């Protein structure tokens, strides 16, 4: 109960007990096929009955982990604001815990989901500002940084999963319109991969040209080994794939322009898309000069960025800044059991590799579970060195 009090503060003991209760349950990992099937054959009633419990479980699991963060981070104003949002949302959902399945109740539930989505819209930026506040005020020791990295991977993939549940329900059973008539909620049963790649490239190019007045071109090669000669499509959440590609294109463009100079003929970014029997594989290759192995190990950490922090007044969307682009993109890839990693040759360029499950029944949610193991990871003291020098951790490959 002490951990709960650290998080909830002034909230009632009854709500604290509910938090303890729901954190004892494991979240239900769904496959993208289950999302798709339910979107086609499910009912608003059954979705309501599932969500009103599952959202409480997913919130409670991650809220317990928030309470285990280092005390120096817990007291940062931006971090406290995020916790308040989560506590408010947990309390809002509790009102439906024993609610009757009636049209007006389900309508109010939909309204509440939209309120929660809006409330949490700036969670990523606000948590990032909390880390900046911590760095500027007290600094971060190695042990705390490892715990924060472990937590944030779990926190953000939990956030992705909660928003997926909410958006899927609101598009299928609410008033939110799908992006395309073909979509089942947020899912496209025949996601045109080439189209998503082009959209991400064009938008990243627009941003690059806005900052540098130039941008590298793209050479795209598609290879469908399952249906040779046919366009590549999979069951996917297009917005997730777009997010990954857009962030990687931004990084490649920035590196290419800064390495070669805006006045030179820029080498193109090469993209290879391959549809295999089990995986959709995408490789993005640039000649942006690459990075050393020392830096490569840091690129997926939330406490590191190769660019200065963005302005806090929100006046201009930065091409780079918080340093969250790569770690969040990797989480979007891993959310449905895919992966993403980088291979870099210092002095030449970088390859980004993306793997997504092409078989929807195998594309299952990867969700954090609050447990003894997670508590130990978040609170353990630094270990005594057992090597004379630190070995490369290849952190861009391990979750």
Curated annotation (Swiss-Prot):
Reactions accelerated catalytically: L-seryl-[pyruvate dehydrogenase E1 alpha subunit] + ATP = O-phospho-L-seryl-[pyruvate dehydrogenase E1 alpha subunit] + ADP + H(+)
Query: GO MF terms on file?
Result: ATP binding; pyruvate dehydrogenase (acetyl-transferring) kinase activity
GO BP annotations of the record are:
regulation of glucose metabolic process
- The transit peptide is at 1-18
Classification via InterPro entries: AK/P_DHK_N_sf, BCDHK/PDK_N, BCKD/PDK, HATPase_C_sf, His_kinase_dom
Q: Which SMART domains match?
A: HATPase_c
A Pfam entry, by short name: BCDHK_Adom3
Per the UniProt entry, the Enzyme Commission number(s) are 2.7.11.2
Question: Any idea where the Histidine kinase domain is?
Answer: 123-360
Q: Which residues bind ATP?
A: 247-254, 286, 305-306, 321-326
Nucleotide-binding in keyword set? yes
Query: Does this entry carry the keyword Cytoplasm?
Result: no
Where does the record place it? Mitochondrion matrix
Specify the enzyme's EC class, one word.
transferase
Q: Which GO cellular component terms, listed alphabetically, does the Swiss-Prot or TrEMBL entry include?
A: mitochondrial matrix
Question: Per UniProt, which keywords does this protein have?
Answer: ATP-binding, Kinase, Mitochondrion, Nucleotide-binding, Transferase, Transit peptide
Supply the PANTHER family for this chain. [PYRUVATE DEHYDROGENASE (ACETYL-TRANSFERRING)] KINASE, MITOCHONDRIAL, PYRUVATE DEHYDROGENASE KINASE
What is known about what this protein does? Inhibits the mitochondrial pyruvate dehydrogenase complex by phosphorylation of the E1 alpha subunit, thus contributing to the regulation of glucose metabolism.
* Family statement: Belongs to the PDK/BCKDK protein kinase family.
Q: What is this protein called?
A: [Pyruvate dehydrogenase (acetyl-transferring)] kinase, mitochondrial
Organism in which the protein naturally occurs: Ascaris suum (Pig roundworm)
